[in-house]
């Protein structure tokens, strides 16, 4: 037996599953479909940069998701995501039992546990990537002349009804978010303008106060923040809920109003404009009626923010996804050229990443927000990312994305109704009903040809 095959079998035995051919595994797999998406199976050798990734680091990030999956912290959002979550738990059980794994073993783990599948929206050629980070913002526990913009916790009169929890998908698909009026009526909750104008004043919902509503907005966009208080302590806050209004990107508003060209829209540029134009910024900001409420989380300074999947995010490995398409914990291999080092998209991003968060602007099967960490440098990098990329989802081998197409029956040779009456098809009638040409009568042998006869 070849050395490579022997090593493959050893890794498979270590992980507790047989190294069987892909076709044999496919025959035992459960069919799965991705609605409103196009996808095609690919080989591992088709993934540019796959062999060069740090699979041991990726495996450690994957195990973070596994611990949350085993705790059932987040329910699935549909039939496809439910199947993926169930299959991921089986893979996680093997991974947790085998941990820790060094580089080669970790790579074999992914290759034997998953099948790569290139995925995109219907008719799409590339996915789309943006970046996000955890901002560090100055604040105060008490209102002052300098710090007057409150950061609110979730109001007790915010009610949710429907089949999905509030913290699940943005905007609230399939749920009603509002406030209760009387015993039965639910009305929309206060929008951004109403809240900024004082709708929640006097209810003791303030976690702290920030310098401006621009700071509040950017904390809400990122979904978490480190608040640097005046005594030097750091207060960590994370997304808790939102008011149910649809999210509107302020950058899109600036472009639509010809305030800023699309090519210049970055988070840093938006912040600079808002700080220089506070009155205009107020109106632009309020076009986004969505408003996020926070909760205080107890994390050490070295801990990263907690994502929607309930686990600490890993810079460069955690992504926010659309949960109507994907389950938390799902691995993706993303290929893109990104402006990480500077403004030019020349840094080759070839990396295994994991769905560990979600966000209001993340819509579609090939759309992701990459987490880059906390602080100013992470903010600069994240603010530059608006680039195309190739998405390859790593689907557990217990699921077969082409089974449905493989099992489509061929149509009968002729329509069944016509066959019952022995009716010939149009083609058969054409072939058999065309009359043969009549045979010309034989010319008498004494007849002379007209050609060349003289009168």
Where is each model-derived feature located?
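C-terminal soluble interaction/assembly domains
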Residues: 27-30, 40, 51, 301-455
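Cleaved targeting-peptide boundary
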Residues: 20, 24-35
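Secretory/export targeting leaders with adjacent low-complexity proregions
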Residues: 36-300, 304-309, 453
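Bacterial N-terminal signal peptides
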Residues: 3-21
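N-terminal processing/targeting junctions
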Residues: 14-15, 23, 68, 139, ...
């Amino acid at each position: 037996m070849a050395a490579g095959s022997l090593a493959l079998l050893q890794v498979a035995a270590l992980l507790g599953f047989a190294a069987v051919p892909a076709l044999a595994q496919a025959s035992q797999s459960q069919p799965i479909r991705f609605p409103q998406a196009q996808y095609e199976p690919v080989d591992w050798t088709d993934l540019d940069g796959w062999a060069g990734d740090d699979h041991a680091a990726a495996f450690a990030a994957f195990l973070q998701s596994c611990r949350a999956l085993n705790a059932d912290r987040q329910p699935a959002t549909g039939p496809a995501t439910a199947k993926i979550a169930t299959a991921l738990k089986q893979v996680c059980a093997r991974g947790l039992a085998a941990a820790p794994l060094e580089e080669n073993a970790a790579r074999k783990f992914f290759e034997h546990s998953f099948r790569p599948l290139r995925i995109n929206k219907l008719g799409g050629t590339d996915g789309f990537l943006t970046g996000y980070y955890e901002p560090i913002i100055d604040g105060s526990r008490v209102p002052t002349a300098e710090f007057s913009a409150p950061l609110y916790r979730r109001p007790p009169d915010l009610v949710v009804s429907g089949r999905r929890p509030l913290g699940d998908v943005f905007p609230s698909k399939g749920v009603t978010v509002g406030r209760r009026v009387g015993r039965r009526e639910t009305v929309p909750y206060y929008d951004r303008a109403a809240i900024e104008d004082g709708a929640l004043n006097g209810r003791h919902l303030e976690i702290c106060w920030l310098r401006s509503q621009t700071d509040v907005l950017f904390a809400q966009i990122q979904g978490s923040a480190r608040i640097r208080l005046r005594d030097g302590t750091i207060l960590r806050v994370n997304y808790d809920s939102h008011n149910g209004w649809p999210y509107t990107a302020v950058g899109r508003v600036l472009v639509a109003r010809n305030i800023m060209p699309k090519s210049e829209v970055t988070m840093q540029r938006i912040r600079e404009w808002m700080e220089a134009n506070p009155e205009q910024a107020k109106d632009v900001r309020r076009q986004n009626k969505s408003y996020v409420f926070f909760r205080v989380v107890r994390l050490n300074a070295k801990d990263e923010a907690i994502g929607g999947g309930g686990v600490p995010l890993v810079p460069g490995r955690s992504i926010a996804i659309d949960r109507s398409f994907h389950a938390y914990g799902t691995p993706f291999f993303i290929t893109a050229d990104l402006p990480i080092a500077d403004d030019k998209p020349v840094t080759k991003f070839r990396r295994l990443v994991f769905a560990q968060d979600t966000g209001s602007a993340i819509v579609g099967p090939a759309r992701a927000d990459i987490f880059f960490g906390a602080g100013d440098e992470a903010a600069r990098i994240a603010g530059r990312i608006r680039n195309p990329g190739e998405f390859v989802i790593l689907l557990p081998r217990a699921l077969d994305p082409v089974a449905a197409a493989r099992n489509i029956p061929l149509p009968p040779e002729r329509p069944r109704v016509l066959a019952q009456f022995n009716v010939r098809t149009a083609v058969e009638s054409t072939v058999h009903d065309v009359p043969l040409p009549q045979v010309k009568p034989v010319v008498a042998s004494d007849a002379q040809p007209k050609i060349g006869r003289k009168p």
